[in-house]
């Protein structure tokens, strides 16, 4: 795996997440009904970080849940993906809430579609919003994030790797080639 470019370092990731936290608070006029749901693996620590930044702004931390979605594919060898929700209990109530799904990279949109289906299966939220650290384009479904840390145009033979301290022992985002 050859690194082509580092597109975010630790400070850039933090700045993006702080901005996303402010945007979530501003758009929703506070956090009264806001629930963050991280998509495993890296969406969960991102959701926790955003919740921490929101608590610094609002003096109160929004609830954070997690959603486990697995893809029926090897991410590095094929573009055919069929998301599967592994666990339906996300740890937070979504009925009547503004659910902000948090993930590291949006690509085709299929993972987010599976996540939205899983959230709706748990009850009727007031709204579902989407926060992504990286939007790399190449959507196959009409899904657009509400909050984006960084737009990174890529080719289909490139991979965007988000590395986070909680999972990878380092904070950075790099582009590699397949």
UniProtKB/Swiss-Prot annotation:
This is Bifunctional protein PyrR. Belongs to the purine/pyrimidine phosphoribosyltransferase family. PyrR subfamily. InterPro entries: PRibTrfase_dom, PRTase-like, PyrR, PyrR_bifunctional. It comes from the Bacteria. Regulates transcriptional attenuation of the pyrimidine nucleotide (pyr) operon by binding in a uridine-dependent manner to specific sites on pyr mRNA. This disrupts an antiterminator hairpin in the RNA and favors formation of a downstream transcription terminator, leading to a reduced expression of downstream genes. HAMAP family: PyrR. A motif (PRPP-binding) lies at residues 99-111. The lineage of its organism: Bacteria, Bacillati, Bacillota, Clostridia, Thermoanaerobacterales. Its EC number is 2.4.2.9. GO terms for biological process: DNA-templated transcription termination.
């Amino acid at each position: 795996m050859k690194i082509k470019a580092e597109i975010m370092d630790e400070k850039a990731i933090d700045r993006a997440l702080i901005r996303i936290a402010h945007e979530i608070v501003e758009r929703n006029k506070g956090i009264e009904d806001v629930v963050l749901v991280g998509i495993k693996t890296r969406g969960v620590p991102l959701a926790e970080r955003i919740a921490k930044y929101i608590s610094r702004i609002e003096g109160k931390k929004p609830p954070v849940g997690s959603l486990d979605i697995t893809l029926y594919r090897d991410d590095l060898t094929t573009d055919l993906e069929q998301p599967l929700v592994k666990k339906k209990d996300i740890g937070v109530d979504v009925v009547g809430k503004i659910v902000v799904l948090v993930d590291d990279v949006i690509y085709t949109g299929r993972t987010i579609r599976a996540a939205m289906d899983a959230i709706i299966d748990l009850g009727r939220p007031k709204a579902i919003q989407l926060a992504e650290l990286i939007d790399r384009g190449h959507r196959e479904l009409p899904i657009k994030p509400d909050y984006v840390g960084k737009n990174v145009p890529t080719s289909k033979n490139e991979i965007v790797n988000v590395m986070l301290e909680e999972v990878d022992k380092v904070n950075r985002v790099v582009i590699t080639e397949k």
